[in-house]
């Protein structure tokens, strides 16, 4: 099985940051990416389990994978159009 988290185009370390900082940093990072590129987000704020999927839905990006069973949380998103 391939580890989806192993080769992202970009990585964002949001460890230690609290809402709303992680999603604000994700938005800023994604804005500078090209459509189709991937971003690995590493976070430990429980609010990201709600905020990151919500951000992807609202902004029409794909949540490719998430790992939220333990800390740190990991999310892989693919930029939409």
UniProtKB/Swiss-Prot annotation:
Which ranges does the record mark as transmembrane?
A: none
* Entry-linked PROSITE patterns: UPF0033
Pathway annotation from the record: tRNA modification
Coiled coil location: none
Q: Name the catalytic site residues.
A: 19 (cysteine persulfide intermediate)
Q: Which InterPro entries match?
A: Sulphur_carrier_TusA, TusA-like, TusA-like_sf
| An MF annotation (GO) of this entry | sulfur carrier activity
Where primarily located? cytoplasm
- Cross-referenced Gene3D superfamilies, in alphabetical order? TusA-like domain (3.30.110.40)
Biological processes per GO annotation: tRNA wobble position uridine thiolation
Locations listed in the record: Cytoplasm
GO annotations of cellular component type: cytoplasm
* Key words of the record: Cytoplasm, tRNA processing
The entry's family comment says: Belongs to the sulfur carrier protein TusA family.
**Primary role:** Sulfur carrier protein involved in sulfur trafficking in the cell. Part of a sulfur-relay system required for 2-thiolation during synthesis of 2-thiouridine of the modified wobble base 5-methylaminomethyl-2-thiouridine (mnm(5)s(2)U) in tRNA. Interacts with IscS and stimulates its cysteine desulfurase activity. Accepts an activated sulfur from IscS, which is then transferred to TusD, and thus determines the direction of sulfur flow from IscS to 2-thiouridine formation. Also appears to be involved in sulfur transfer for the biosynthesis of molybdopterin.
Subunit record text: Interacts with IscS.
What's this protein's name? Sulfur carrier protein TusA
Q: Which organism is it from?
A: Escherichia fergusonii (strain ATCC 35469 / DSM 13698 / CCUG 18766 / IAM 14443 / JCM 21226 / LMG 7866 / NBRC 102419 / NCTC 12128 / CDC 0568-73)
Tell me the lineage of the source organism. Answer: Bacteria, Pseudomonadati, Pseudomonadota, Gammaproteobacteria, Enterobacterales
């Amino acid at each position: 099985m391939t580890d989806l988290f192993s080769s992202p185009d970009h990585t964002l370390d949001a460890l230690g940051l609290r809402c709303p900082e992680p999603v604000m940093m994700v938005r800023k990072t994604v804005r500078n990416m090209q459509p189709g590129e991937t971003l690995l987000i590493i976070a430990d704020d429980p609010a990201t389990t709600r905020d990151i999927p919500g951000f992807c839905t609202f902004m029409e990006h794909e949540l490719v994978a998430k790992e939220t069973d333990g800390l740190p949380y990991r999310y892989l998103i693919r930029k939409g159009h």
